[in-house]
Amino acid sequence: MVLILNGPNLNLLGRREPEVYGRTTLEELEALCEAWGAELGLGVVFRQTNYEGQLIEWVQQAHQEGFLAIVLNPGALTHYSYALLDAIRAQPLPVVEVHLTNLHAREEFRRHSVTAPACRGIVSGFGPLSYKLALVYLAETLEVGGEGF
């Protein structure tokens, strides 16, 4: 089972700056992730919050709840949440950071991820497919013992 976590403002997908983030809503993204997970033999649980503390608690509790991995879109917390970085580092599960947009093609302040150093990798810039690519990676690595590349 993979926990898919989405941070602040992702509840506005499809309505907030669709020229930047696309027209896929959060509900549609959840359905896509469930379908992709099923294709890959992975169960997924999909959550979203606008609160940094809630996101941190979910990361901290994921292992105890029986999840095998986390797919994380921290939203703007990517760029400044050292508390989230510490939470990722403090738990044993593999985490893949995802972003709908290409961080390096955005404004200067969005080009740096403070959370990335604690993650196995980042998938950025492929819209909803960023989530699928993260799930493909996790399906492959969990299948071979979780070591990854």
From Swiss-Prot:
KW DNA damage (keyword) present: no
Catalytic residues (UniProt): 21 (proton acceptor), 99 (proton donor)
Residues annotated as site: Transition state stabilizer: 16
The reaction(s) this protein catalyses: 3-dehydroquinate = 3-dehydroshikimate + H2O
InterPro entries to which the protein is assigned, alphabetical: DHquinase_II (IPR001874), DHquinase_II_CS (IPR018509), DHquinase_II_sf (IPR036441)
Gene Ontology annotations of biological process type: amino acid biosynthetic process; aromatic amino acid family biosynthetic process; chorismate biosynthetic process; quinate catabolic process
Annotated EC: 4.2.1.10
Pfam families: DHquinase_II (PF01220)
Name of the top EC class for this enzyme: lyase
PROSITE patterns in alphabetical order: DEHYDROQUINASE_II
SUPFAM superfamilies: Type II 3-dehydroquinate dehydratase (SSF52304)
Binding site for substrate: 73, 79, 86, 100-101, 110
MF terms in GO: 3-dehydroquinate dehydratase activity
Keywords: Amino-acid biosynthesis, Aromatic amino acid biosynthesis, Lyase
Family: Belongs to the type-II 3-dehydroquinase family.
The protein's role, per its UniProt record: Catalyzes a trans-dehydration via an enolate intermediate.
Subunit note: Homododecamer.
NCBIfam families in the record: aroQ, PRK05395.1-2, PRK05395.1-3, PRK05395.1-4
Record-given protein name: 3-dehydroquinate dehydratase
Species, as recorded: Thermus thermophilus (strain ATCC 27634 / DSM 579 / HB8)
